[in-house]
Structures are given as structure tokens and as C-alpha cells.
């Protein structure tokens, strides 16, 4: 352990990494042609190094949050104590309030915050979940996010085959990407449901806010007998009243929040009774500090928290540590625990980024007890894909 009174942030390095995809794939909002990540590396004068990641949406240039970190946040943090995490969170938030509060600015803050927690864990030789109060669970059930399109409409047969592949890989929870037109969505779900019949698989759907209220309701009604765990982003993030209306009309739990930011944004969702399940992304909601704020707020409103994650291995590791520490919202001996989003779409560098890649253990993810995030970054991989030299 270093000297708690003297440790200082010596440098902050931003790594923008990208890789083109051999086969682009689509979600409802467009075609993903490359995978990107904005990673931050924070170095201290005591030799501790922390890693963080800003959530980079499928269509979002990673350079945006990188510029935020380099130009707006780094000058605030140099020579500060990396252990003053909450103090620094508010310092960053307050300094960017007039041009931030949402989007890539908060993603930049999130990346820095994750790296600071990684440093704190390494400094104290403790995993982050222990610093958050302990682990409610040491193993986490993953769910396969996939079912993206490589042609567009008319892929029901291929998506059904994908469902069987996920099942063979021991996934018993799967999230299906919809939003390609109501008729096509329903055909795809029928095909997936048919091949998984009697296999005890739980499905979720995610339209990535492709529809207005009427179409979103029609889709939910058509799938009401599928026993869906949740219906994600049925309408646009701005249409909070639409969320509330759908939640009151449908018998499917409504989920959302990956495009919301900080406890202030989630307070609006909760006060409007807009969601059954909140889905903050740790790489964009304010980091580990930000998600702590949101979890506590959600508990007071009786809303479940199930973090969203679509980033690289750093974001996955942060999500695992946080999910381990989330209390069940509605306590019972058979209470439903949060599950880990495990993206199954093409990602050239996610596994390669770690010296110890994430592996499933009999269909579950083990929560690392190593210090900090519990990962070791493969710097050669960072340099291989880095494009902001």
C-alpha cells in the first residue's frame, strides 16, 4: 500500500481504439461497421495504474468522449489524489455542467471514474465489489445479446439458428434485437420461440427506440404470451410519458435507461413511473460512482437495476463488479437477481484486450476477487488497435 496522504495523479492517457468489421451488422438505428472503444489510463506517482472505459454507442465516434477527457477533465485532475473519488466526480460534473450533463461528456466522466475505482482497489488490495460494500452474489448469470441483422429484414430462419447456438453455449437468457418493422419482428420472434420451446430459455426484446407509442404497444401485445423478462427501449428516450403509458397498458416489464445519465436523469424516469427495470450503462451514467447514486435512488422507488453493457472488456469487468454489489429490489427467498449483458456480436479486440479474458463457468460468470477491476490489460492489443497517436 502506498502513502494515502501523498499519492497523486501523474498522467491521464486516452486510447482511442477501433477495428473495422469484416461483416457489418445492423440494429434498428443503423449499420455497425466498426467496433470502437475509448479507454482511459490513469497513472499515479506511486506506480498504481487504473483503467476505465467510456461507453461508445454503435454509431458514436469514440473521439468525442476522448476529446472531453483530454481537454475538459484531465486539467482538473492532474496532481489530485485519485482516492478522492466522490470529490473528483463532483468536481468534474460541476465543471462541465453548463455544457455537459448528458451524452459524451458524462461518458468521459464515467471512464475516469472507473479508472479511479480501479486504482483505489489496487491501492487497498481489494476488489471493487468489496469497496462497494461486498458481494450479494459471487456468480452472475449472463444473457446473450445478439440477433443483429446482416441483411436487414427476412432473417427469421438465421436468427432461430443463432438462438440454438446460444443455447448450446449454455445461455438460458437471450435478448433479441428488434425494430425492423412489426411484421418482421413478430416473424423473427415466432421462429426463435419455436426452436427454443421446452428448453427453459427466458427471452427479452430490445427495439432500440425504433417505434412510436402505437407501434410499440402493438408489438408488446403481439408478444404478451412469450413471458418476456423485459421490453427494452420501446420508445425514444425523450418520450418519458410514452414509457409511462406503455408500462400501464402492457403486462411486460418495461426497461430503459442506457441513454439516460446520472441520478438526475434517472430521478425523472422514476418519478414518472416510467420503468420497471433501470438500465444505466456504467460507461455513460457517471461511472461506478454514478451507478452507486442511481442504485440507491432506484431502491427508494422500488425499481430494479440491471446495468446495460455493450463495451469492451474494461466495461464488462466494471459491470461485473457492480452487479455483484447490487441488492435485490424486491427481497424474497426466490428474489430475481440482476444479470450480465454478454454481447455476442462481432468484436475483434474485446477478448484480446485482456491477459485473462472473460470465460463462462458452466453457464455463469465468476466475480473476480482480484484487486480493482480484477483484470490485466494487454497493452500490445491497445497499441495494435490504437488510432490517436
Where are these regions (language model features)?
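A cross-domain feature marking catalytic cores of carbohydrate-active enzymes
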Residues: 54, 144-146, 176-178, 205-209, ...
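Shared catalytic-loop signature of beta/alpha-barrel
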Residues: 221, 227, 238-255, 260-364
Amino acid at each position: 500500500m502506498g502513502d494515502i496522504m501523498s499519492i497523486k495523479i501523474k498522467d491521464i492517457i486516452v486510447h482511442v481504439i477501433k477495428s473495422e468489421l469484416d461483416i457489418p451488422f445492423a440494429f434498428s438505428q443503423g449499420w455497425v461497421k466498426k467496433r470502437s472503444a475509448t479507454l482511459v489510463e490513469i497513472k499515479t506517482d506511486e506506480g498504481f495504474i487504473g483503467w476505465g472505459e467510456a461507453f461508445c454507442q454503435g454509431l458514436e465516434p469514440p473521439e468525442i468522449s476522448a476529446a472531453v477527457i483530454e481537454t475538459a477533465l484531465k486539467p482538473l485532475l492532474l496532481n489530485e489524489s485519485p482516492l478522492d473519488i466522490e470529490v473528483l466526480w463532483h468536481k468534474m460534473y460541476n465543471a462541465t455542467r453548463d455544457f455537459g450533463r448528458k451524452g459524451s461528456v458524462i461518458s468521459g466522466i464515467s471512464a475516469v471514474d472507473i479508472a479511479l475505482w480501479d486504482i483505489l482497489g489496487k491501492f487497498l488490495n481489494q476488489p471493487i465489489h468489496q469497496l462497494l460494500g461486498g458481494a450479494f452474489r459471487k456468480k452472475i448469470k449472463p444473457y446473450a445479446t445478439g440477433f443483429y441483422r446482416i441483411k436487414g429484414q427476412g432473417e427469421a430462419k438465421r436468427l432461430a439458428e443463432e438462438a440454438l447456438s446460444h443455447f448450446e453455449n449454455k445461455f438460458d437468457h437471450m435478448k433479441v434485437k428488434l425494430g425492423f418493422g412489426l411484421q418482421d419482428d413478430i416473424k423473427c420472434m415466432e421462429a426463435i420461440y419455436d426452436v427454443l420451446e421446452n428448453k427453459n430459455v427466458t427471452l427479452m426484446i430490445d427495439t432500440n427506440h425504433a417505434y412510436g407509442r402505437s407501434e410499440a404497444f402493438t408489438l408488446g401485445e403481439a408478444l404478451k404470451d412469450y413471458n418476456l423478462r423485459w421490453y427494452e427501449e420501446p420508445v425514444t428516450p425523450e418520450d418519458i410519458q410514452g414509457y409511462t403509458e406503455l408500462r400501464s397498458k402492457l403486462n411486460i416489464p418495461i426497461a430503459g435507461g442506457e441513454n439516460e445519465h446520472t441520478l438526475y436523469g434517472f430521478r425523472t424516469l422514476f418519478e414518472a413511473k416510467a420503468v420497471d427495470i433501470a438500465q444505466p450503462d456504467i460507461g455513460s451514467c457517471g461511472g461506478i460512482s454514478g451507478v452507486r447514486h442511481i442504485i440507491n435512488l432506484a431502491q427508494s422507488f422500488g425499481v430494479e437495476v440491471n446495468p446495460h453493457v455493450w463495451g469492451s472488456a474494461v466495461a464488462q469487468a466494471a459491470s461485473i463488479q457492480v452487479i455483484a454489489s447490487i441488492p435485490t429490489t424486491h427481497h424474497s427467498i426466490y428474489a430475481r437477481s440482476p444479470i450480465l449483458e454478454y454481447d455476442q456480436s462481432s468484436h475483434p479486440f474485446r477478448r484480446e484486450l485482456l491477459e485473462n479474458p472473460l470465460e463462462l463457468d458452466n453457464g455463469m460468470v465468476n466475480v473476480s476477487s482480484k484487486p480493482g477491476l480484477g483484470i490485466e490489460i494487454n497493452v500490445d492489443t491497445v497499441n495494435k488497435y490504437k488510432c490517436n497517436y
